[in-house]
Every structure is written in structure tokens, then in C-alpha cells.
Amino acid sequence: MKNSIQVIHTGSKGNCCVIWDSQENGLLIDLGVSFPKVNKSIEYKISHICGAVVSHIHKDHAEYIPVFASNSVEVYSNANVREKYPECRLLGRRNTIGAFTVFPMSVPHDVPCEAFLVKTSDDVRILYITDTSGMKWLCKRVNYLIIECNYDTDTIIDRKYNENYTTGSKYFNHSSLETCLDYIENMDKSELKGVILWHSSSTNLNKARAKEAATRAAGIDNVVLAKSNLIMDMIDDNF
């Protein structure tokens, strides 16, 4: 699991992934998956985990904070999350968490929410964006992008027509395929090596279309849809 991004799970039932560096130090992002499941997925190497960062307070991202904290995992998040979960440490503008440096960036959602730029001990840069209607921050020298691609407008329109389907307002707080593509097209892709499409709806996204469009926008072949137990190896010129 060295030099990799490991997806534990993503979706409305829970979100969690791990960033691993070359020394097998790990950083957890979001804690919406149970401790036993995460621990099993990482082959019981919880002692290798430097800490965890949580994007926002919603259950599918934060539910298991107390359990991880009680198992000696230092958890960091914003003030809104800390108010409910006092076990959390408050994120600053720049955070050293073991072998990782984490820069949080506020993004629009229906609760305070953070995107994260993570820098590993090997100077690999991973940008994580979830649960937002749009991301204004254009970070330079991103090597790997984990970005929400929750739904696409055409699929929702088709469902409304064929199934009398009503989305409600919740989708306005998530990234559509169109929003995701707009970000990829406008970001600095000079050092981009991989993209993971995150938090995708099982019913409101044409996943084949999303992957094809994101691959075209990114200009690289290493574009995948997140799924449980997916591992994306991170390749760096220094390795």
C-alpha cells in the first residue's frame, strides 16, 4: 500500500480513503466508514495512520470520529465539526499531521465544508474535493485529484421524464458532472497523473459517460470511478 490512494468506500452510506506515502505512513480522509471495516481494509495497520481529516459534519463523512479518536487516531476538522465532536482538533491554515502536510480550503455546501490539499513526505500533492456545488480554489502542481462527480443533469432530466422523479434541493449542494469537468478543464494539469471520480450517485450519473468526459478533460488515461477497495498507485519521478 505504499505510494497509493486507497478507497475504503464512497457514497451516501459512507466515505473514507487513505493516502499512503513511500514509508507506509497513512492519512485518513473522512470517517464515514466504521473503524472495524477501515482497520480490516488497511490490513490492521492502524499504527501506521498518522491522523485523519474530516471535510464536514454530515454522517456519511463524520459518523465514526469518536471511535477513531478512542483508538488513538488524531482527528482534525473545522469548528462546526469540533462543536459536535470535541475529540477533534481544530484545523489551521497549514497542518502537519505526521508525515503529511494538509491545507484545508472552505468550499460551499449546506454546512461548513473543507477541501484538502495534501502533501506527502515524498512531495506528492493530492487534492480532495467533495460535497460542494463548486470549488473556487485552483491549486498548482496537483499530482492526483479526488473530486466529487455526483450526478449529471441529463440523467436527472431523463429520470424526471420517465419516472416522475424529483431530486429535491440536495443536489445543489453536490458537484455535478458539469461542475467536475469545469474544474478539471481549468486546473493546472501540468503535473497531473491521476483522477478519482468520487461520491458518484448509483442512479443519477451515467458513469461510463462521466469517465469518458473526465478522461478527455484531464488529458490523461489514468481516470477512474471510485469504488470500494480501489487502489491507485502514485508514481513520482523521484521513486
Q: Where are the model-predicted features located?
A:
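Short, polar loop motifs at secondary-structure junctions
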Residues: 33-34, 58-59, 77-84, 90-94, ...
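Catalytic phosphate/metal-binding cores of nucleic-acid and nucleotide-processing enzymes, i.e., regions
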Residues: 1, 51, 222, 231-239
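Active-site metal-binding motif and surrounding structural segment of the metallo-beta-lactamase
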Residues: 25, 34-77
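Active-site regions of enzymes building and remodeling cell-envelope glycoconjugates
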Residues: 70-75, 85-104, 142-147, 221-223
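Active-site environment of divalent metal-dependent phosphoester hydrolases
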Residues: 57-62, 82-84, 110-112, 135-137, ...
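Cap/insert and terminal regions of metallo-dependent hydrolase folds
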Residues: 140-228
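Catalytic core of the metallo-beta-lactamase
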Residues: 95-148
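Conserved beta-strand hairpin/beta-sheet module of binuclear metal-dependent hydrolase folds
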Residues: 1-42, 114-131, 144
